[in-house]
Amino acid sequence: MALRHFLTLRDLSSLELNSILDRASELKRQQHANQVYQPFKGKVLGMIFEKSSTRTRISFEAGICQFGGSAIFLSPRDTQLGRGEPIEDSARVISSMLDIVMIRTFGHNIVERFASFSKVPVINGLTDDHHPCQLLADLQTYQEHRGSIKGKTVAWIGDGNNMCNSYMEAAHMMGFKLKVGSPKGYEPKPEFLAEFAHCVEVFNSAEDAAVNADLIVTDVWASMGQEEEQKLREKAFLTFQVNEALMALAHPECLFMHCLPAHRGEEISENMLDHKNSVVWDEAENRLHAQKALMEFLLNENAKRA
């Protein structure tokens, strides 16, 4: 039985993905009821951050601690994968001392190479190409508020980035339609579009993408590492702000999500996070519960190999 990792959503079957989402909501109910559940006492999560993040660190560290385990945080100063010691060597050593590893980095090939030589499950906390953990939280949040997302229409407004790529995978696996609204030159990569043409439609207009949507999602215009492009991107994305006027084009019960941190007055209007259909704060909290369900799944799957 092969070691299981979570580098993209498609490392899970659709059945496993749905099971993890249901389990996340169950763990959330337990947590809110102050029920203690510590199946992983003595287990250690290694968190390797080459890209910093408040939400990712807190949610993973709190999650493993609530399970009775502990976490080790490695900042960019502590380890530089592939710069100095080869990634393959780092993976062999680090994984020999841990039970599970989460990596948040730039190139997706870094997590792939690390996982190839790891003795324990590896979780992609974010790469330039994928953000699957955020999708777990988003899918859980939609399910909790509106039920099944199958057959629904999701509008992605903004850059064809890692979040957009993971949404395309989710559309394929969960059976919803994804309408991407991006400025010309900022659409998703052609290879992703070609693979998911059956469930993804691209528009160079935010309004066209938002029409009849059941969920509208956006992200910052310039991600970490794109700061030099900020002014150029502000100009390109000027008509791609999510605001009340855009929400009015969607279904009346359309939800709004943003993975945070948000730049009010840029990709969203000043009050959008507090819009009556915004579920951003539930979405943020669900990072904790979704990742707990994921870690439980991977650790239990790995235990079957012993």
Curated annotation (Swiss-Prot):
The pathway where this protein functions is:
Amino-acid biosynthesis; L-arginine biosynthesis; L-arginine from L-ornithine and carbamoyl phosphate: step 1/3
| Pfam families assigned to the protein according to its UniProt record, in alphabetical order | OTCace (PF00185), OTCace_N (PF02729)
Q: Which domain of life is it from?
A: Bacteria
Q: What EC number(s) does its UniProt record assign? A: 2.1.3.3
Which of this chain's residues are annotated to bind L-ornithine?
A: N162, D219, S223, M224
Q: Which UniProt keywords apply?
A: Amino-acid biosynthesis, Arginine biosynthesis, Cytoplasm, Transferase
Q: How would you classify this enzyme at the top EC level?
A: transferase
Q: What's any GO biological process attached to this entry?
A: arginine biosynthetic process via ornithine
GO molecular function terms listed in the Swiss-Prot or TrEMBL record: amino acid binding; ornithine carbamoyltransferase activity
Q: What is its main location?
A: cytoplasm
Report the subcellular localization.
Cytoplasm
User: Its GO CC terms?
Assistant: cytoplasm
Database matches in PROSITE patterns: CARBAMOYLTRANSFERASE (PS00097)
* Role, per record: Reversibly catalyzes the transfer of the carbamoyl group from carbamoyl phosphate (CP) to the N(epsilon) atom of ornithine (ORN) to produce L-citrulline.
What protein family does this chain belong to? Belongs to the aspartate/ornithine carbamoyltransferase superfamily. OTCase family.
Q: Which HAMAP family does this one have?
A: OTCase
**What is this protein's record name?**
Ornithine carbamoyltransferase
